[in-house]
Amino acid sequence: MSSSHTVDLNSSQLASARRLIWPTAAVIFLFTVSYPANDFAPPPSPPDIGLGMLLVYAAIAAVTGGVVFAWVLPWALRQESSGGVALALAVLGTLLAPAFWAGFPPALAAGGALLGWAGIHARKGRSLSRAAFGIGVLGVHFNVASYAAVFI
């Protein structure tokens, strides 16, 4: 006797994406804040920015991360198709990667990539989700490369 059951890949992917929202948000926040923190506290020289400016950068990163990961992604994951939203986030995060220091491109790119990944097996908007995933991953890489270029 054999038993077979089907696995809904879309439901599994959505559940995984929901579990990854907060860890992704935390990593993106720490990455975004690490740049001004590095300017604030280099040991051998006086800081380039003051505590107030560091807190402004942290606030921008927190608000952007909050909007993307606490509001947009949970809302979009409840929709039948979230490919368009994912693509918009991914494209913005990728195009704005050279301005990663502004505090919001990393969250946009990562949010677009995560949302795109969540919709790869969706019944509707699958192509947009796949494009968003690819562009979002590229955007995250561009943000990291832009960050690294500052220190090389």
Question: For the regions a protein language model found, what residue spans apply to each?
Answer:
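Polar low-complexity intrinsically disordered regions enriched in Ser/Thr and small residues
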Residues: L55, G119-A122, F142
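Membrane-associated alpha-helix detector
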Residues: S2-A97
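Membrane-helix boundary connector in multi-pass membrane proteins
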Residues: A97-A131
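Central hydrophobic cores of alpha-helical transmembrane segments
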Residues: V85-V91, A113, R130-G139
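Juxtamembrane boundary at the C-terminal end of a transmembrane helix
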Residues: H141-I152
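A broadly tuned preference for mixed-charge, low-complexity surface segments
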Residues: R78-S82, G125-S127, Y147
